[in-house]
Amino acid sequence: MSNAQQHLEKAIQIHPEFADAHYELALILKDKKEFEKSKEHFLKTIEIRPEFPVAHFNFALLLHEMKDHKTSQEHFLKAIDLDQNFANAHYHFGLLLAELEDFEEAKNNLEKATDIDQNHTLAYYHLAKLLIDPEDYEKAKKNYLTAIDIDESFADAHYYLGKLVASGLKNDKDGTLVRKPEYEDAIYHYKQTISLDKKYSKAHYNLALMYKIQKKYDDAKKHFEKAIEIVNDYSKAHFHLAMLLKETGTITADEKPSNKEEASVG
């Protein structure tokens, strides 16, 4: 007998009602993608020990992977009912609800996760991604910034914060819909994304758009080209690079001839 699975199976053979052994074996089988066998042992665990919040939680995760969303929801709720401060249960339940397009309940659960665990980076991040209404602009921005404050190396949080502030679509104090792009902040966060992941093609593309707006054409061209180098079939990058080259006559500032050279032409 040489591995954990074999010993757990032996423990269950000796003591069939050993809840912890069924639970640990279920986790191993889940990791091995043996989902049906894992499910059997989670069910047995819960049958023996119904008030086992972590078992309900991990069973819910398994059921989510198995696309049994209804039963998954039931076990997330059971885990939360048994442990009101189970941040990860709220977090993963929130992700499932978002996948099922129940966005309000998803936001409620992600926010609850951050209330319980104020260092739950991913909960802040995914909550921010769901806060797409212009009236939630500042709240979304705050959640991205909190995620970044906890984990400065969170490239996706920098990227999506860059997109948010680049759009600048929000409600003014009187409720009027306004667009107030924060281009310098967007550029900063796109640059941070690229510094963390040099092959983040979308960050190069969006940074190029910012530079194009600012008429920094050489920088824009450089990052459009970089996006295409990373993802050759990036159609939007090809299109906007083409429009940039058309707009600038394909001659960038660095390529323009000097006055002396101009005089000698023709």
PLM feature segments, named:
Residues 122, 126-129, 156-163, 188, ...:
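Eukaryotic tandem repeat interaction scaffolds
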Residues 1-10, 31-44, 64-78, 98-112, ...:
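Structural signature of tandem alpha-helical TPR/SEL1-like repeats
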Residues 159-173, 239-243:
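Amphipathic alpha-helical repeat scaffolds of TPR domains
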